[in-house]
């Protein structure tokens, strides 16, 4: 096809092309119809303000007025002054639609329509020359103008526009789209027949298949109404021929002698009136169009503008201006002052601006709110489906991220992390449960337990061991020299051979007067050699040793096996050897240990020399003060020493709760020892007696301090 005269850049959309091309000589017609009277147009009228004029692009305000009574009401057309020009005089019943391209020529097009509204859903009527609509058939279009369109094609009209640019119909291949009138402008240059141009132009003006049908009809009414009223202002009839070119100079001779009969678009075939129709007295380029064609365009455009509040006032102002022949001083839409030369250019600019306001972002919303109807079910389903899909996507993404995080944690920390996450990370009870279930102690707990073993306080050891089975003997005030037997110091209900995860500490004190220096028991010293010294006694032996180490424990390396332990203090005082007879003169202070509930092979903790402190310097100071206070006349006699409490010097034992070979009923040689003790207990000047009493006091203090291993004190006189 030839290129458009206006160009696609100036008129970017096909709907505006339809508006501009339908009145193809409007520019010259506006110049030829001067002057206009200025007395009728009330520019300060409220309906001429900008908001009312911009309502032309609002589909909801326009759509419900486009009913058949607006299109078919010939009384309104008579009031507009176009009914007389609707039909030519005496030409017959043939309509101007009956052209060479139309298959059948019926008297009227719109008389065959039976729908209550031209735009009522779900049917959409599009007039096409190839779809045989002039026989009464209806076309169900699904392009972007259809309000019942539900496909993606409705939102994308570019494919139709591309086909129109080539001059082809988007629905038919062998004909041109009636919406595209650019070929009509060029066809007039090549002297095509008037019937072809007139029928295509009129069908396109009456067609509603543009991308925005209400806007195209409403905005084109301004241009067409001016031309129609200018054409209807003369009572004379001027015949013309078909053989003139489309654009004309102002001086064009009209020497034609045939008449045309035109049926009005809104009138039935029986309501045609034969009148004389003449253009203005001077020649103008609109004279080549048929009079009935202009009347039809005028009736449609007037009906469209009357449907809009601003458009109605604009129509009335233009009608008054056309009747008086004066140009307005300012634009009724924007209020801009215009000269006579700028009026028609500004008019087309306003049409272009109104269409651009309505073409873009409101296109989808116009379909949803068309004629105040609810959106199509397919559109509602699409919105609901998209919302549901978004929620599903969010849920799936969250679940997937959680699974990935879980895998990363398992790969990084292993199953131990997953087991530990089941319990509280700060609660020690939960940590203990975790350790019991997994069978291993967490590394941080293992380090803490090792520190506690190395730096444990001896005084608070009894509080930490509630089930140790050792009840400390507290000497009574009445009998300070008597000590309970070791069999009563132990809990007989305790289970032997079971540590229960609790650590025990033992300290054994053995005071010996041994003439044989090679016989020394494995002992743990209570009083260090540097801290205290007794009068007339030799330096004490102090050491920590293990007699038998059988094997290491399975849980920790701090557990060892020990048979017995005691503290040996050799007293070499000469006075004690002279007042005592033989081996029976030895003063022995022994404290047995209640180490666990096992035999002599039981696990016992052995720590460094610095950490195991059973007494302090305060205790030593007290012992020395009591020794000074006790003189020769105030010494106590140790009475009621039972043979059960006696122990041989060479055989220190570890008390146990089990009846067996380690039972503490050693009765050998107890009679001699008892007699020796009784004979020597009356000696008030004996320093060994002072030593025994002082050791008794120190052991009672140790028992009150909470040392769990002190159970028995044996004294030999």
UniProtKB/Swiss-Prot annotation:
Role, per record: Required for the correct synaptic targeting of motoneurons RP5 and V to muscle 12 (M12). May be involved in the negative regulation of Tl in M12. Involved in the correct patterning of veins in the proximal (costal) region of the wing blade.
Comp. bias (Polar residues): 140-152, 471-482, 630-640, 687-704
GO biological process: negative regulation of DNA-templated transcription; protein ubiquitination; synaptic target recognition
UniProt KW keywords: Nucleus
InterPro entries in UniProt: E3_ubiq-ligase_RNF220-like, RNF220_mid
Subcellular location: Nucleus
Tissue-by-tissue expression: In embryos, expressed specifically in M12 (at protein level).
Basic and acidic residues bias: start-end ranges: 442-451, 513-522
The keyword Ion transport is assigned to this record: no
Taxonomy, superkingdom: Eukaryota
Name of this chain's protein: Protein Teyrha-meyrha
One GO cellular component, as annotated: nucleus
Compositional bias annotation for Acidic residues: 452-466
Organism name: Drosophila melanogaster (Fruit fly)
Disordered: annotated span: 140-214, 229-270, 440-498, 511-539, 563-594, 624-717
Knockout mutant characteristics: In embryos, M12 position is closer to the ventral nerve cord and situated ventral to muscle 13 (M13) and external to muscle 6/7. The longitudinal orientation of M12 is also oblique probably due to an alteration in the muscle attachment sites. Also displays a reduced number of synaptic sites on M12. No effect on muscle fiber size. RNAi-mediated knockdown results in the fusion of the costal vein with the L1 vein in the developing wing, producing an adult wing that has a continuous wing margin with no separation between the end of the costal and L1 veins.
Biased composition (Low complexity): 195-214, 523-533, 570-580, 667-686
Compositionally biased intervals (Basic residues): 235-263
A molecular function (GO) term: ubiquitin protein ligase activity
Membrane spanning stretches: none
A Pfam family matched in the record: RNF220
Main location: nucleus
